Every structure is written in C-alpha cells, then in structure tokens.
From Swiss-Prot:
<keyword id="KW-0963">Cytoplasm</keyword>
<protein>
    <recommendedName>
        <fullName>Inactive ADP-ribosyltransferase ARH2</fullName>
    </recommendedName>
</protein>
<dbReference type="InterPro" id="IPR050792">
    <property type="entry name" value="ADP-ribosylglycohydrolase"/>
</dbReference>
<dbReference type="Pfam" id="PF03747">
    <property type="entry name" value="ADP_ribosyl_GH"/>
</dbReference>
<dbReference type="InterPro" id="IPR005502">
    <property type="entry name" value="Ribosyl_crysJ1"/>
</dbReference>
<dbReference type="GO" id="GO:0055003">
    <property type="term" value="P:cardiac myofibril assembly"/>
</dbReference>
<comment type="function">
    <text>Required for myofibril assembly and outgrowth of the cardiac chambers in the developing heart. Appears to be catalytically inactive, showing no activity against O-acetyl-ADP-ribose.</text>
</comment>
<dbReference type="GO" id="GO:0051725">
    <property type="term" value="P:protein de-ADP-ribosylation"/>
</dbReference>
<comment type="similarity">
    <text>Belongs to the ADP-ribosylglycohydrolase family.</text>
</comment>
<dbReference type="InterPro" id="IPR012108">
    <property type="entry name" value="ADP-ribosylarg_hydro"/>
</dbReference>
<dbReference type="GO" id="GO:0003875">
    <property type="term" value="F:ADP-ribosylarginine hydrolase activity"/>
</dbReference>
<feature type="modified residue" description="Phosphoserine">
    <location>
        <position position="27"/>
    </location>
</feature>
<keyword id="KW-0597">Phosphoprotein</keyword>
<dbReference type="GO" id="GO:0003242">
    <property type="term" value="P:cardiac chamber ballooning"/>
</dbReference>
<dbReference type="GO" id="GO:0000287">
    <property type="term" value="F:magnesium ion binding"/>
</dbReference>
<dbReference type="GO" id="GO:0030017">
    <property type="term" value="C:sarcomere"/>
</dbReference>
<dbReference type="InterPro" id="IPR036705">
    <property type="entry name" value="Ribosyl_crysJ1_sf"/>
</dbReference>
Amino acid sequence: MEKFKAAMLLGSVGDALGYGNICRENSVLGSIQEELQKTGGLDSLVLSPGRWPVSDNTIMHMATAEALTTDYWCLDDLYREMVKRYVETVETLSEHRPDPSTIEGCSQLKPDNYLLAWHTPFSEKGSGFGAATKAMCIGMRYWKPERLETLIEVSIECGRMTHNHPTGFLGSLCTALFASYALQGKPLVQWGREMLKVLPLAEEYCRKTIRHMAEYQEHWFYFEAKWQFYLEERKIREDAEDKVTFPDNYDAEERDKTYKKWSSEGRGGRRGHDAPMIAYDALLASGSNWTELCQRAMFHGGESGATGTIAGCLFGLLHGLATVPRGLYQELEHKGRLEDLGAALHRLSTEEK
C-alpha cells in the first residue's frame, strides 16, 4: 500500500516541481536551479501550496483516481463517472494553466446524455500530454497481468474523452501500462518494448469500437514509430537487449536538444508520445536517485510539469518515498486526498472487479 500512496504523492510532487520550473522560466524570478542553489537544494525545499501549487496534471489524475475508486457496476458506469468528474473539474482549472486539449476535450463531453456521455469526435488538436498525465492510476487499479484487457479498454476510453487522437490516447495507454509494469516487478529496461507489443491489442480494440478508424490510422503509426526510434536509439528495442545506452555527453543542454528532437513541435513533452518518453528516459538514467530524476524529468526546457508528473508517479511505484526529502511532500497541496486515493486504489486492485 505504501508504494501506491507514494505514487500518488510523488506524481504531484513531480508536477509541482515541473510546473514551478515552467512558471519560473517565464518570470523574472530566475531559474529554478538558481533558487535551489540559494536555498540549499532539494533537501531543504518545502513544497507549500501557496508557493508551489500543483497544475491541472494532478487535478485531472485525482479526478480519474476518484472515478476508479467509486462503486461502479460496469465499465460504462465508470466512464459516466469519469465524464461527470472531468466536467466538474475543468471548471476549476483556470488558475492551473491547463492543457488546452484538456479544456477543448471536456467541452465535448455530455454528462447528461446517458448513452453518449463519453463519445467525443476525433480531434486534430487532441494529441497533447493531458491524456498521459491522468492515466497512471488506471495501471495501479488494473495492474495484474490478467487485467490487461480491462487496462487497455479503460485507458483508451479515458484518454479519448479529452484527447481523441491516437498520439493523445495512446499516451494514456502507455502510462497506465508503465504503472502496471512497475507493480508487476517487470524490469524497467523492458517497459518500452513490452508496451509496443500491446499496441496491436489496442488497435484491435479501437477497430471494434471506433466507427471511422481511417482518420486515426496515420497518427497511430506516428506514435509507434516514435517509440521504436527511441528504443533503437537507446539500444533496448530487441528482447535480448537489456543494457540501456546513453550518449557520452548528456548534460542538461544536450538533454534539452534531445527532448526537442523527440517532440513533434520543438517543445519536449508537449505530446502524448514524448511526455511518457522523457519520463521513461529519466527513470532509466536515474535508478533510485530522486535528485537525478528531478534534473532530467522536472527541470528541463519543455513541458516539465507533464513529464514530472509521470516520472514522479512511476518512481513512487518503483522506489517508494525512502530517498525523497520529506519537505517535498509533507505540506504538499491535496496531500491527504492523494494518500487516501492511493490506499483506495491498493485495496480495490487486490479485489476482483
């Protein structure tokens, strides 16, 4: 149970740090690195809600987790619950610098329409990171290998509610799968290629449930190709390849260049394929070193709130809170609620439903 709580907490810690990084980038306060040097580094930092608020990444992840921990009878009821919570949540997001795709996607949801509540049209603008950052808890709820089919369906439908574009909703499948792999104890180096093996099952599900699959097809291959390229770059694409390879020079400046290269628009982590990719890359490089993870996933020149949310949550599932300074989570915004959701997800994941 402790790792479930840690995952919910550290996802939000990663969000607060990454979101704070973006806010400070765009202000006269100076960079987050300068601020940390003055205050004594991450060990001395206290994330208080006033100075280090969370963004919409945390708020939407909590909304997903809250829906997953209700007493729903069937998946359609779960989807109606998600729709209701997303629509209620999005009305409160204006001060949280929300992902525009999330706002637009929620505007298409119909909580009062019993049959069509979560059915939204294909969206060219739905490729953003917001589907990926709200789906780790789905992998926590359905982490067992025998629940893979449910994980695929729920993560895709959850993603499509707000990001009905393969680059968007395959991001939610990806982060849900990664969370399940962490809890299964699957070696980290295998996660990317195991995720690619699941994509045909996801495509099969979409063919059965999406009426006009043709407009999705081209974008589908984009997500897959980007991940294949990444895994080949790190030399972990094939089953026999279990040693990750990084460039000799991979400092902050080089990482920013690489993150931009992986993106589709020059801002690392902006889309559903590269937000999980940057988080995964950071986890591969950092091991159990929390400070190193922050340097790679929370403090970069792209969408560091999104990548920080994903990386923090997965780190919690892998390593718990042992190496994380207490100041980062003891006063964290929504701390009690996050811990309660982690406990509820743990309890429900051990029961059959």
